[in-house]
Every structure is written in C-alpha cells, then in structure tokens.
UniProtKB/Swiss-Prot annotation:
Keywords: Autophagy, Cytoplasm, Cytoplasmic vesicle, Disease variant, Endosome, Golgi apparatus, Lysosome, Membrane, Metal-binding, Neurodegeneration, Protein transport, Spinocerebellar ataxia, Transport, Zinc, Zinc-finger. Residues 14-26 have a biased composition (Acidic residues). Plays a role in vesicle-mediated protein trafficking to lysosomal compartments including the endocytic membrane transport and autophagic pathways. Acts as a component of the HOPS endosomal tethering complex. This complex is proposed to be involved in the Rab5-to-Rab7 endosome conversion probably implicating MON1A/B, and via binding SNAREs and SNARE complexes to mediate tethering and docking events during SNARE-mediated membrane fusion. This is Vacuolar protein sorting-associated protein 41 homolog. InterPro entries: Clathrin_H-chain/VPS_repeat (IPR000547), TPR-like_helical_dom_sf (IPR011990), VPS41 (IPR016902), Vps41/Vps8 (IPR045111), WD40/YVTN_repeat-like_dom_sf (IPR015943), WD40_repeat_dom_sf (IPR036322), Znf_RING (IPR001841). Coiled coil: none annotated. The gene is VPS41. Changing residue 791 to F: In SCAR29; decreased protein abundance. It comes from Homo sapiens (Human). It is linked to Spinocerebellar ataxia, autosomal recessive, 29: A form of spinocerebellar ataxia, a clinically and genetically heterogeneous group of cerebellar disorders due to degeneration of the cerebellum with variable involvement of the brainstem and spinal cord. SCAR29 is a progressive disease characterized by delayed motor development in early infancy followed by difficulty walking due to an ataxic gait or inability to walk, hypotonia, and variably impaired intellectual development. Expressed in cerebral cortex and cerebellum. Highly expressed in Purkinje cells. Residues 1-540 are annotated as: Interaction with ARL8B. The keyword Iron does not apply.
C-alpha cells in the first residue's frame, strides 16, 4: 500500500514538472534520448552499476559482475564475465586499448582489449575504484591505481613483474578516483587529495564541507576539466580547483605544485555527477522533495543542469528534469554522469536506464521554435544555417508559417510572406491562391502575385480581377494599371466591364479602366473616345504613343476644349500629320480657339501662317488686344490698310499711331498722339524715333499754347532741337509750370554738352599727337636696300651690277623701290612724288621717304 502511494505521488509530481516545462519559454540547451538496443536487453535482467566512455565505444558494468562493450547506439560488441558480484568501476586508457575493472568481491583485472596482456589480483576487501594510466599503452606508463581501504599504485617492473606502493591509507574507504596526465585525484571519507606521479608527492588536501552526509550514500564526484583544473562535487558543494606551479623562492620543503580554489558555490540539490562543457559545468543532481498531500519525502526525477561558475556563486543556464526508469527507488549513489569530450555527449547512468544528453543542433533549435509557434524565427534560423540543417527544409517551414498566419487571421502578412517563401514555384503559388479563395481572401494576396518569372495561369489572374470587379472598382482599376495585359485574357475582362457598365454607365472608374483595357487590346479608337469623354489627361499621351493623329482630325475642338495649351503644342509639333489648314478649318466655328492656335503658330514662326495674318488682325482685336501691337510690329505679311481700318473702327489709338507711322503718315500719327492721347512724353518719344525736323516743328506749334506740353518739351528737347527756337515762341506773360527748373535743366544739359565736347576734343588732340609721333618714329626708321630688291617699274635689280657707276634710287615708305629715271616727273602743282603702285592721292602713304644717289 505504501509502495502504491509512493508511485502515485511520483507520477503526480512528474506530470506537474512536465506542465511547468511546457509553460517555460526558455529553450533547453540539451536534448535527450535513451540508449537502447543492447542496453535495453541488459537492463531488463540486470542493473547498471558503472560505465565509462571512450570516443569509440562504451563500457558498461552491472550488478551481476558483467562488463559489456557497446557501440554508441548501445549495441553489444563484447561481453566479459568478470565476477559474480557488482562491478564497482571500469577504467580505460586514452587509446581505448586497455581496460581496468574492479568488483565488490575484491577482484582487480587490467587487460588489453586487443592483446594478451593481462593482470589479475584478488584482494581481501571490496575494491571500490580503479584508474589506469591515461597512456597505459606506452611501455613506460604501465601503471594503475586501485582503492579500497587504501590507495595502491601498481607499476610493472623491468622483469614484467608488478610491484605495488601505498599512496594513502587510514582515512576510510577510497570511493572516487580520476587520473589526468601526471596527476591523480581521489576522495576518501575525509576529503580530496591530489598526487603528482612525477615528483611522487601529494600536493593538496581539500576537506569535505558537509561531514554529516554519509560518504557511501552521497559519494564525491570528480572530473578533470583539463590537465590542471579539477572540479569537485560533494553533497551540495562544488569547488573548482586549479593546480599551479610554486615559485622557486617558496619551495623549501613544500611540493613544487599547489592547489588554488578559484570558484566555490552551493547547489540546491545533491550532486551525483559533474562534467565540463566549455567554460560551463554540467551537473547531475539527486532530488528529494516533500509531497504536498502526504507530507512525506520522496525521490523526484534527477535534474541535469548547465551552470556558469562564478568566484563565489553560480548562474543557472538551463535545468532539465529527467524521467529515468525507476527514479523513485534510486539513491544519490545510484546515479553516475559520464561524458565524451570529443563530441560533448553526456551519459546519465542509473541502475535501470542510460540516458544520453547531447548539445542541441540547429535542427533541434528549429524544432523547438516550431513547437512554440515561432515560425518567423524558425524560418530565419533555417535560412542562416541552411548548409548545416539535415531534417528541415526552408520551404516546409515557410509553408507551415503561411498556414499558421492564415489560421491566426493575419491574411495580409501571410500573403506578403508568400513572395519570399514561394519564390518562383508556380504550382505552389496557384495552390496558395486557391487556398486564399476558399477563405474569401483573394484581395489580400493580389498585390503580391508574381507578374513575370513565374507567370501563373491566366485563370488565376482573371479570378482575382473578377473578385475586385464585384466589390471594389478602385482596386480593380489599380490591378489593371499595375498588371501587364498579357497575364489574363483581355477580351474576357473587357466583356465583364461592359456588363457592369450596363448597370452604371456613367461610372468614371469603370470607363477609365475600360479605356486602358482597349489600349492593351490595341483598340485605340474606342480608348480615345472614352478618354475624350472623360477629359482624361492621358489622352495626349495615348495619341503620341500610338500615333493616333488620323483619328483626331475631327476631334480637334474636343481636344482644345479639354486642354488648349497641350492640344496646340501637339498639333504644332505634328504639322506633317495634321496640316495647319485642316486645324484652322476645324476651328472655324470657334474663333477664340482658332486665335489660340494661330497665335502660338505665329510665336513659333512669323512666316508659316502668313496666309492667316489678315484673319489674325480681327482675332487679336477681338480676343487678345494686348498682343495686337506686337503682332503688327513683327508681322511682315499683314495688310496695313486692313489693319488700319480695323484699328480705327475700334478706336485703337496706339495701334493706329503705329500703322500711320509705318505707312509714312508721321504727322497724322503725331497729331493723334497729341489730340487723342494727350501724352507729350509719348509725342516726344515718337518725334525722337522719327528724327524728322518737321515733326519737331509741328510738335512745337501744337504745344506753344499748352503750358504742360511746353514744360515737357523744355525737359526733353535739348538734345534734339535748339531750345532757343522754343523759348522765343513762348508768349510773354504765359504761366508755365516748373519753368525755372526746366530752364536750369536746359542750362545744365548745355553745360554738360560743352564739357563733353571739350573732353572729346582733348582726347582727339591727344590721340592725334600720339599717332603723329608714332608715324614720325616709323618714318625715321631705315630701309634695307640690297641686290635682291628690284625696281617696281622696270623690274631690274635696284642696284647696278657695277657699283662704280653713279646711280639714283627712290624708296617709298611702303617699301616699294624705283630707279629715279623710271619714275614719272612730278606735276607742276605738287613737287612731291608718290608710289605709282600704292597711291594716287596727295601725300598718301606711298610718298617718298628716301632718295639714294651716288
């Protein structure tokens, strides 16, 4: 009955722990699996008592005195019947070629697995531990230690005899030993000792902390992290010890090495085993808990923790409760933790079970993320480690992610992820589209559908377009604009739009979309008609892009009404396709539009539309008077008489003045300025432009009885007409506004003219003198005359061949030379001689500068 209660309590606590583990969001660091195959068969009839691990195989000892060699999958490869009682410990050297075994009946065996080498000894007390030298395979290292009531070192002598030496005794049974390099560490009832096999010295003693615990029930756990770091676990205490070299000055009678405890901390549970994992520790803990129902203590599942040692405490990295067979009946001494350094494998050994813990790989990490429904993180992890993952495929994870998002109702995110996950797989795309159709979410996936590489079946795109056409005209129009026309059957969609227009014929969105569909279908005429009806800005682009000028010859007025600027620019840019004559004829009933076209044509080229210049006079007068005068000034083809007639009819004074002056009737023009405009400044400006004395006289005569005009003339006439002529004609007693200022200005202008003349005269005299001096210097220069020069008249050498004969040569400044007798005699009016070639004028540049005689 008590046993049943215990089992019930154990199962209850197990389920509680499992629920807690499920709720935990922290990913485990290790994964676990039972060592099965041959191990399962062994433990059904026997119980495990110890195990040791090599990189190549495992060695398992049992309570019935058997030793089994196993492969890493747990298959039995060899079996040794060592003793009829419990195997206490198995030890292997680093090569895995030699094995040491000790048992409860005092038997010790050390033998070669692949050689006939063997040692047998039976002691009179149980042998609890054995450790062979790590390099036992070497002839110089044939050593091993055993421990019962004392620690013995066995060493083979030169005659192949084994001799033993006592390393330690008197402190109770030796219960644990670990040999690493030249150091042996063991634990007895009092504490932990370390022995240096080279110096034959014991270098430390680390006492145990909790002496209240029975050492046979709570044995010490030892493991070497490296050749100089020993980790000790006993009870709930963990110590990390570092073996260091002692300085020569501190030697005296002390060992050459000493031990320093670099980290020490307490754990929550009793320690059954230790193993290193990089800079962390793996700790197997024996757990006892009190049942809430019965308030009795029971054995709970053992725990495997990864902890980070600190100087005086530790940080828990992960903690897993292990469900091993028969854990309710086990004690702390029944658990062992063995490890394989090469592969970071940890073996949890109990009498009825062997569990293997290993570091989780990327596949395990992805499994955990998928289990926690962290699909996006799982997908990212798979993409980063795609070369290392073996059990997962990126596509499968992605599809699971999409399904998860759909189930959660995140349709837009699911659709967006399809782009990345489905890639170029057309079949998967089509499958997902149908799945979105089934849940009524085609709109969600529509923005992300592939539009090329891959291209899906036309039916897929048509299905989505129909979905939008039924419920969302704007969305439908957007898809038509964005999707290439070759993705779907255009005629099917056109017919569907027409059917909808029968219900709503004035829907601008549908009409515009239909025009775009017509454009894709190259039915440009229908598209243009719709665009013009809608007055859509794309109409000009459509005409240009598809060269539809032949289709718009009868639609020019519509285009001009829509956007006259763009329409005129287009028509003028394409005169070769639609002639000026055709445009003017089409606009005959709309003179205001006709004017806009002809005005822009005139701006571009004054001569192209010359046949319409007469018509333009009336158009400018009617619709655009500000541009009439510039037109009259720039046009050389408009009839002046017609223009004058129109301007006079409309009383356009400025234009009439310009036309009169252009026709040579300046007096009438001036008279109109004076009489119609009463603008003396404009009259003066006009007189200045014409520069005609008679006009000035008329202007003076008209202004003489008008004081304001006289003031204007006095202010502006000074540089064109002598002011005295005006002043003499002013009647005495006439009051003239600002007369004094005007006279002062005249005098100032006169003084300015005098100053300017004097300044100009000075400049002229200075320049003349400078040029005269320059000419004089030039004329004073000598001229070379030699045998190569000829007479320009007779063309014979200028110098005679006989230098003794007398000769006479005339040289001009122009460098022409003549014999004196070849020159004509000077005239009676002027004694000067001139070069016959260069000048016939008096005192020209060819006047003689030198006469040579001999």
């Amino acid at each position: 009955m008590a046993e049943a209660e215990e089992q019930e309590t154990g199962s209850l606590e197990e389920s509680t722990d499992e629920s807690e583990e499920e709720e935990s969001e922290e990913e485990p660091k290790l994964k676990y699996e039972r060592l099965s195959n041959g191990v399962t068969e062994i433990l059904q009839k026997d119980a495990a008592s110890c195990m040791t691990v090599h990189d190549k195989f495992l060695a398992l000892g049992t309570h019935y005195g058997k030793v089994y060699l196993l492969d890493v999958q747990g298959n039995i490869t060899q079996k040794f019947d060592v003793s009829p009682v419990k195997i206490n410990q198995i030890s292997l050297d680093e090569s895995g070629e030699h094995m040491g075994v000790c048992s409860e009946d005092g038997k010790v065996q050390v033998f070669g697995l692949y050689s006939g080498e063997e040692f047998h000894e039976t002691f009179d007390c149980p042998i609890k531990i054995i450790a062979v030298h790590p390099h036992f395979v070497r002839s110089s290292c044939k050593q091993f230690v055993t421990g019962g009531k004392k620690l013995l070192l066995f060493e083979r002598s030169w005659m192949n005899r084994w001799k033993s030496a006592v390393l330690h005794e008197g402190e109770g049974n030796i219960r644990s030993v670990k040999w690493r390099g030249h150091l042996i560490a063991w634990a007895n009832n009092m504490g932990v000792k370390i022995f240096d096999i080279i110096s034959k010295q014991r270098i430390t003693n680390v006492p145990r902390d909790d002496i209240s615990l029975r050492p046979d029930m709570y044995p010490c756990s030892l493991c070497w992290k490296d050749n100089v770091t020993l980790i000790i676990g006993w009870g709930t205490s963990v110590k990390v010890c570092s073996v260091k070299e002692r300085h020569a000055s501190e030697m005296r009678d002390l060992p050459s090495r000493y031990v320093e405890i670099v980290s020490q901390f307490e754990t929550e549970f009793y320690i059954s085993g230790l193993a290193p994992l990089c800079d962390q520790l793996v700790v197997l803990s024996y757990v006892k808990e009190i049942s809430e129902k019965t308030e009795r203590e029971y054995c709970a599942r053992p725990r495997l923790d990864i902890i980070q040692p600190l100087s005086e405490t530790c940080e828990e990295i992960s903690s897993d409760a292990l469900t091993v067979r028969g854990f309710q009946e086990n004690e702390c001494r029944d658990y062992h933790l063995e490890y394989s350094e090469g592969e970071s494998l940890f073996y949890i050994v109990s009498p009825r079970d062997v569990v293997v813990a290993k570091e989780r790989d990327q596949d395990d990490h992805i499994d955990w993320l998928l289990e926690k429904k962290k699909y996006e993180e799982a997908l990212m992890a798979a993409e980063i480690s795609q070369k290392n993952i073996k059990r997962h495929k990126i596509l499968d994870i992605g599809l699971a992610y999409i399904n998860h998002l759909v189930e959660r109702g995140d349709y837009d995110i699911a659709a967006r992820k399809c782009q990345k996950i489905l890639g170029k797989n057309a079949a998967l795309w089509e499958y997902e589209v149908y799945k979105f159709k089934e849940i009524g979410q085609l709109k969600a996936i529509s923005p992300y559908l592939p539009r090329g590489d891959p291209v899906l079946k036309p039916l897929i795109y048509e299905m989505i377009l129909h979905e939008f056409l039924e419920s969302d005209y704007e969305g439908f129009a957007t898809l038509i604009r964005e999707w290439p026309g070759d993705l779907y059957n255009n005629s099917v969609i056109v017919q569907a739009v027409r059917d909808h227009l029968k219900k709503d014929s004035q829907n601008k969105t549908l009409l515009k979309t239909l025009a775009e569909l017509y454009t894709y279908d190259k039915n440009y005429g229908n598209a243009l008609e719709i665009y013009l009806t809608l007055r859509h800005k794309d109409v000009f682009q459509l005409i240009h892009k598809h060269n539809l000028f032949s289709s718009i010859k009868d639609k020019i007025v519509l285009l001009m009404d829509f956007d006259s600027e763009k329409a005129v620019d287009m028509l003028l840019d394409n005169e070769d396709k639609i002639s000026i004559k055709k445009v003017v004829e089409e606009l005959e009933d709309r003179p205001e539009l006709q004017h806009v076209y002809l005005h822009k044509l005139f701006k571009r080229d004054h001569h192209k539309g010359q046949r319409y210049h007469e018509k333009q006079i009336s158009l400018y007068a009617e619709y655009d008077r500000p541009n009439l005068l510039p037109f009259l000034r720039d046009s050389t083809h408009c009839p002046l008489e017609k223009a004058l007639e129109i301007c006079q009819q409309r009383n356009f004074v400025e234009e009439t003045v310009y036309l009169l002056s252009r026709m040579g009737n300046s007096r009438s023009a001036l008279k109109m300025i004076m009489e119609e405009l009463h603008d003396v400044d404009k009259a003066i400006e006009f007189a200045k432009e014409q520069d005609d004395g008679e006009l000035w006289e008329d202007l003076i005569l008209y202004s003489i009885d008008k004081p304001p005009f006289i003031t204007g003339l006095l202010n502006n006439i000074g540089t064109h007409v002598d002011p005295i002529l005006l002043i003499h004609r002013i009647k005495e007693g006439m009051e003239i506004p600002n007369l004094r200022d005007s006279l002062v200005k005249i005098l100032q202008d006169y003084n300015l003219q005098i100053l300017l003349r004097e300044g100009c005269k000075k400049i002229l005299v200075a320049d003349s003198l400078s040029l005269l001096k320059k000419m004089h210097r030039t004329q004073m220069k000598g001229v070379l005359v030699d045998e190569e020069n000829i007479c320009e008249s007779c063309l014979s050498p200028i110098l005679p061949s006989d230098a003794a004969k007398p000769f006479s040569v005339v040289v001009f400044h122009c460098r022409h030379m003549f014999h004196k007798e070849c020159l004509p005699m000077p005239s009676m009016n002027s004694a000067a001689q001139f070069c016959n070639i260069c000048s016939a004028k008096n005192r020209g540049p060819g006047s003689a500068i030198l006469e040579m005689k001999k």
